[in-house]
């Protein structure tokens, strides 16, 4: 994982090796293998499935930003929109199963807070070798796994050889109380619940019956992944500073609501009979503080804020050398 901002799209990153190799990453993969054999989303979902082949066997890794039953008031990302039956659990869950042979799995979690500026400080939670807390730049999250964890300076590491049929997991939690799956069964259940959430959502869509249906479904799921449920806003992209052309300077921070882009994306969902997101976005607009002449800005923060002052991070090398890296 090369990019993750928590607890929201526009929060400072904890993993940003997408923009600089030293700015934090999270690996959960076979030891010594850097390139997967296959990678795709579980059909009808935003659960990522990665298949790894090694000289000694095969494993399959699943990654999910998990969804669960609405727990009540959300103190992590406060809602201004009415709640739905499901809501974000504020955790990233990763599971692995050995399909064949024996495969050594490598867990390396090396966050670097505030866009690579602050290395993590780790402690074992309550002395438990299966739970470690990372803190920095005013943020804290918990890593929990059925692998034994060891602290190596600003990173945590775990290794284990999986036998055929054996499963393992790790979970990163920034939820209230740093709640995280207690065992692999719990982790798999949360991924399964997330799968059901996505399939239930896309099941409401009116998809055309032709050879582009799969691509349309995948596009709809991507758009839904760009919506911010607490306010109804949508972002143009979950990333910043990826150039329009290789090595170019047109590399903006798109983690905000651009009025034109959001209109097009929600029009696409409306055409598929997925109207709730469009309704929520209209309410988001209605809640915005107007300008002095009553007009709308071209963009807003996902919480409705108007001031999105831009800064640059000259200490980051940029995506494939594309600079500057822009924030805001």
Q: Predicted segment positions?
A:
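Acidic, mature catalytic/reactive cores of soluble proteins
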Residues: 1-328
């Amino acid at each position: 994982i090369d990019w993750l901002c928590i607890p929201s799209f526009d929060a400072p990153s904890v993993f940003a090796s997408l923009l600089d190799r030293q700015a934090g990453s999270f690996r959960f993969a076979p030891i010594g293998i850097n390139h997967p054999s296959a990678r795709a989303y579980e059909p009808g979902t935003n659960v990522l499935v990665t298949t790894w082949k090694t000289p000694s066997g095969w494993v399959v890794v699943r990654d999910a930003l998990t969804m669960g039953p609405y727990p009540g008031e959300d103190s992590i990302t406060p809602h201004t929109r009415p709640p739905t039956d499901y809501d974000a659990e504020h955790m990233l869950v990763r599971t692995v199963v050995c399909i064949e042979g024996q495969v050594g799995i490598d867990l390396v979690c090396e966050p670097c807070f505030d866009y690579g500026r602050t290395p993590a400080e780790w402690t074992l939670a309550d002395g438990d070798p299966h739970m470690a807390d990372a803190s920095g730049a005013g943020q804290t999250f918990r890593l929990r796994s059925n692998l034994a964890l060891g602290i190596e300076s600003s990173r945590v590491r775990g290794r284990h050889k999986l036998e055929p049929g054996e499963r393992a997991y790790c979970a990163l939690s920034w939820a209230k109380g740093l709640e995280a799956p207690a065992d692999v069964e719990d982790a798999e259940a949360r991924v399964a619940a997330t799968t059901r959430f996505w399939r239930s959502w896309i099941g409401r869509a009116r998809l055309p019956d032709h050879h582009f249906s799969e691509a349309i479904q995948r596009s709809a799921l991507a758009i839904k992944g760009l919506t911010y449920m607490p306010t109804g806003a949508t972002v143009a992209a979950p990333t910043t500073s990826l150039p329009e052309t290789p090595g170019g300077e047109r590399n903006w921070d798109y983690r905000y609501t651009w009025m034109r882009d959001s209109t097009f994306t929600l029009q696409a969902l409306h055409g598929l009979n997925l109207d709730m997101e469009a309704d929520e976005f209209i309410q988001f607009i209605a809640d915005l503080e107007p300008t002095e002449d009553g007009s709308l800005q071209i963009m807003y923060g996902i919480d409705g804020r108007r001031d999105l002052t831009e800064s640059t991070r000259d200490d980051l090398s940029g995506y494939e050398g594309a600079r500057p890296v822009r924030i805001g």
